[in-house]
Amino acid sequence: MSRPSSTGPSANKPCSKQPPPQPQHTPSPAAPPAAATISAAGPGSSAVPAAAAVISGPGGGGGAGPVSPQHHELTSLFECPVCFDYVLPPILQCQAGHLVCNQCRQKLSCCPTCRGALTPSIRNLAMEKVASAVLFPCKYATTGCSLTLHHTEKPEHEDICEYRPYSCPCPGASCKWQGSLEAVMSHLMHAHKSITTLQGEDIVFLATDINLPGAVDWVMMQSCFGHHFMLVLEKQEKYEGHQQFFAIVLLIGTRKQAENFAYRLELNGNRRRLTWEATPRSIHDGVAAAIMNSDCLVFDTAIAHLFADNGNLGINVTISTCCP
């Protein structure tokens, strides 16, 4: 989608660096879109999958599909006796030849199998060669991922796997919750009750007290097309001495689902307009990377004041579906 035109961005409710006040709803006129006023807030093992190893040449890519008992037996040789994840290169053994993964090894004083010494470190080069010829299951196979991967590709895939647990998407709240996609909205409604939800494809996101000092987040939910979208406006000092606002829309859903939608943010007033149109990001991706790359609506405090009214900034938010 396009970058902001000579019109502008839009934003919403804080979940940030001070205790969040209750959102106030701005009375809407008869026909216009819904509007919510959001007050600024203050600062704010997975089990090893059923084995699905496939023999491949060294460095050979991933795959998916049924696996033989022999493959299961082979990959089971790499299971860590402590966490039951796989022991991947560099592979270290105790003096008796037992394996333990590098993460668990750092927490142990002796071998969990024979109680022998773990030092000095002894590389098991033979097992490393075998590991390079095997495809390992993704650690999230138990929740639906069917990929098997070379050990060099496994960590990177698992960092972005669609089947990994979802984290709380509320920015600035330092919430450590994790769970399934189906449980995200329930978590937000019970643990973050100050977040307002508005219904409809077109709403007005009214962020209040935008002149608050320091880093502040405004967050609001928008419900339409059978999905929930999270509207986020962040104010932060990305560059020293230069505060900026970043506005973005996230889908409470997968990356594939997000591709079915587009959003438009618009600042409008005083015979000026600033717009941004893009595809929403999945909450699996979060907002940090988008802000780092300025892949969202970005404007500084001077621009914000052109559209603000007594320290309050209204952003028009429109969600639409994309043609297949």
From Swiss-Prot:
Query: Could you cite one Gene Ontology molecular function of this protein?
Result: ubiquitin protein ligase activity
InterPro entries referenced in this protein's UniProt entry, alphabetically? 7-in-absentia-prot_TRAF-dom, SINA-like_animal, Sina-like_RING, TRAF-like, Znf_RING, Znf_RING/FYVE/PHD, Znf_SIAH
Indicate, by first and last residue, each region the UniProt record lists as having compositional bias (Low complexity).
Answer: 33-42
Which residues, renumbered to this chain, carry the PTM Phosphoserine? Answer: S6, S16, S28, S68
Please name one Pfam family that this protein belongs to.
Sina_TRAF
Q: Which residues carry this modification: Phosphothreonine?
A: T26, T119
- The EC number(s) this enzyme carries: 2.3.2.27
Q: Does the keyword Phosphoprotein apply?
A: yes
What activity regulation does UniProt give? Inhibited by interaction with SNCAIP (isoform 2, but not isoform 1). May be inhibited by interaction with PEG10.
Please tell me where Zn(2+) 1 binds in this chain: C138, C145, H157, C161
The protein's PTM annotation reads:
Phosphorylated at Ser-28 by MAPK14, which mediates the degradation by the proteasome of EGLN3. Phosphorylated at Ser-28 by DYRK2; this increases the ubiquitin ligase activity and promotes degradation of EGLN3.
SBD: where is this region? Answer: 130-322
From the UniProt entry, list the residue stretches annotated as the region Disordered.
Answer: 1-42
Q: Which GO terms describe its biological process?
A: amyloid fibril formation; apoptotic process; canonical Wnt signaling pathway; negative regulation of apoptotic process; negative regulation of canonical Wnt signaling pathway; negative regulation of extrinsic apoptotic signaling pathway; proteasome-mediated ubiquitin-dependent protein catabolic process; protein ubiquitination
Q: Where are the zinc fingers (SIAH-type)?
A: 133-193
Q: Which reaction does it catalyse?
A: S-ubiquitinyl-[E2 ubiquitin-conjugating enzyme]-L-cysteine + [acceptor protein]-L-lysine = [E2 ubiquitin-conjugating enzyme]-L-cysteine + N(6)-ubiquitinyl-[acceptor protein]-L-lysine
Q: Its principal location?
A: cytoplasm
Quote the tissue specificity entry: Widely expressed at low level.
The listed outcome for T26A is: Strongly reduced phosphorylation by DYRK2
| Extent of Pro residues compositional bias | 17-32
Which parts of the sequence are RING-type zinc fingers? 80-115
GO CC, alphabetical: cytoplasm; cytosol; early endosome; intracellular membrane-bounded organelle; neuronal cell body; nucleoplasm
The record's similarity note reads:
Belongs to the SINA (Seven in absentia) family.
- What's this protein's name? E3 ubiquitin-protein ligase SIAH2
Record lineage? Eukaryota, Metazoa, Chordata, Craniata, Vertebrata
